[in-house]
């Protein structure tokens, strides 16, 4: 009969739940989930945002495009995704695709102010739209992330990705560890791009 010491028993008792939590978190960081908002605003494109220049604006200029909304952070270990996101943007931009990046210090890895973020993005060759630093979690989260939270998915870390259709409604959520060059993301973008533009449909 195998005898276990009290110390080993305690370690096992606490270690297994912790391991389960780590595995669950890792799975969510790599998750690809179809999503749909439950209420609130009808479209991402009607929401207010703050630009890197500190001006209040909206996302109206991107209405009718497929958008990938990403929470970014300059000092995150996943910041290598910046150039990968740029490649993705260049691949699909002429087909009606845009990446909308929202810097946040909610995970303590974006210490820069808006001016500093501009410098970082310029140094990394980023040409897709980047907005002012904001909250993406909690009671102070921005209107954009309040809207996206209605999908039931919230970022666990930097570089989580929401794919939004031409109608401004979320289509899918991709965890932080899903690479911008992943086949799953490319397929989802292409499916969304194949959907008809709701503005053109109204004109017809």
Report each predicted region and the residues it spans:
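N-terminal secretory signal peptides that target proteins for export/translocation
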Residues: 1-7
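Hydrophobic membrane-insertion alpha-helices, especially the h-region
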Residues: 13-26
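N-terminal "domain-start" segment that seeds a small globular fold
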Residues: 30-60, 80
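Amphipathic alpha-helical repeat scaffolds
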Residues: 51, 71-75
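Loop/turn elements at helix/coil->beta-strand transitions in domains of secreted/extracellular proteins
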Residues: 64-67, 94-98, 124-129, 158-159, ...
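Structural microenvironment flanking redox-active thiols in thiol-disulfide oxidoreductases
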Residues: 78-141
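Thiol-/selenol-based redox modules, centered on thioredoxin-like
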Residues: 143-146, 150-204
